């Protein structure tokens, strides 16, 4: 995902990806610097309602755009501004009622976000 470095405070740096702003570990980069962000599909928790009281710094609302399976795993493409791929189990898909068009929340820690030079 293409992004831009935002402000840093304490131990974190904000990164903007289109209209989406997420928290990462503190970056030794200048605000406005172009970067590439990587977030593993298995590093994201998918929730059907807004989670509360979490240590994870990133909670992003989106809409399920696609659902497909491969080798026993289920993948969802969530439109959260940028399109983000999330890996879940078939049980999770069934229990959460994940279908195209559903609103969901993506939850991930700042430390799960990798930042690279653009």
What are these regions (language model features)?
Residues 4-5, 64:
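Conserved hydrophobic positions within beta-strands
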Residues 7-13, 67-73:
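Short, conserved beta-turn/loop elements at beta-strand boundaries and strand-helix junctions
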Residues 13-17, 74-79:
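SH3/SH3-like beta-barrel fold
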Residues 19-68, 75, 87-118:
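Glycine/charge-rich catalytic "coupling/switch" loops of P-loop NTPases
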Residues 33, 80-82:
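Short glycine/proline-enriched coil/turn segments at helix->beta-strand junctions
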